[in-house]
Each structure stands twice: as structure tokens, then as C-alpha cells.
Amino acid sequence: MGQKGCPVGFRTAVTKKWRSLWYGNNQEFGKFLIEDVKIREFLKKKPSCQGAAGFVVKRMSGKIEVTIHTARPGLVIGKKGAEVESLKAELKKLTGKDVWVEIAEVKRPELNAQLVADGIAKQIERRVSFRRAMKKALQSVMDAGALGVKVQVSGRLAGAEIARSEWYKNGRVPLHTLRADIDYATASAETTYGIIGIKVWINLGEKKAVPAANHAGAASTAAA
């Protein structure tokens, strides 16, 4: 089933860490889960978080800590930290709890599936040929040291009347191998012909299993 399921969810607690770190009883779990989704959806819409690769939510004694993984930390922090303070205030208003925001820089954006997918989406929205955008992304990912990469786009490609899917692949992308560190992400491009969906798989090599202490009992959502 490695071909059908989400590669990140498939490997969570095996070689991937949880993206939500908290404990919740039967009464709290649903509330916390919905709150996590709201936080992520809110951050995705913020202009300062457009270059974000993902968000990790931690909870402890009535407080929430949100770690924003981004290739452009200066954009999230803002002038003299003004943007971060604004995010804290807005998140506190959204959740009703004290929220601490941490910034984690993505050192190699070419090897991050979310950033690669977002880059392809932006190029398609700027009317760059989807094939050219895909091939350019493949080349940059492989040049950065990946063992394999696959990119797929779906929709009314180049304004075609009938929607279809096209994909390009370079190297190895073993989706069934749990020890393979596969990064996966999706994005969408809004064009005059409709929505174009983008999927990216990147093989970063083999990885040891995540220690049990990092995930035992933690609740998670797979949405980034």
C-alpha cells in the first residue's frame, strides 16, 4: 500500500516525527485536533509564512508552542521582530491561549518537498510551461544531493479541455521501503483554466527509526 497512502503518514513514528506533540484525553483530543488544524490553516494564509515548509504544534500546561520551518526566517520574523509579535497576538486571539512562536530555518530548501511543490505552483501561476517547471525542479533536487525525485501535475494542463496527469521521475523513490526517508508534499496552482494539483516525492536516503521516546503517546495530525 506504499503507492496509495501518504508517504509521510505511512512513516510517522517510524522514521518521521509527529507534527503535533501533545497528550489529550477523550474529552480534549477532538478539541485539540481541530485547534491544530485552525492554527495551520491560519498560518498558511499569512503572507509572512508563504515560504514555510511546515508547522509543528506543541502543548504544555495551557500554553501552545508553534515552530515554523521556513527557508526565509527574516520574512517571518519581520523588522525588529514585529511580524512574530503580530503572529503571537493573532494566534492568541484565535485559540484563547498563550502562544509562543519559534522559527526554524530550512537549510536546504531544494530538498524540502513542500518548498519544491510551492515553487512549481508559483511558476505555473506565472504561466511558465508546466513541463519546464517540473524538469527544472527535478534537476535542482538531484543537484542538491537527493537519491531520487518524482513530480506529478494534474488538471487542465496547458488549458486542455480534458484534465490529465503527467509526471517525471529521476533516480529511485522506493515508497514501500519504510526505512527510506521519503519527503512528500502537495500544492495547488490557480490558473485561468482551473486548479492544477502538484505532488512531489523526494528520496533523501535511508534513515534510522525514530526513538520511541520521541513519539510514544503523542497525538498527531498529518496535515502540514
UniProtKB/Swiss-Prot annotation:
One Pfam family in the UniProt entry: KH_2
Keyword Protein transport belongs to the record: no
Keywords linked to the UniProt accession: Ribonucleoprotein, Ribosomal protein, RNA-binding, rRNA-binding
GO cellular component, one term: cytosolic small ribosomal subunit
rRNA-binding listed as a keyword: yes
Cross-referenced CDD domains: KH-II_30S_S3
Domain KH type-2 residues, every copy: 39-107
GO terms for biological process, alphabetical: translation
GO molecular function, one term: structural constituent of ribosome
Similarity annotation: Belongs to the universal ribosomal protein uS3 family.
Oligomeric and partner information: Part of the 30S ribosomal subunit. Forms a tight complex with proteins S10 and S14.
Protein task: Binds the lower part of the 30S subunit head. Binds mRNA in the 70S ribosome, positioning it for translation.
Protein name: Small ribosomal subunit protein uS3
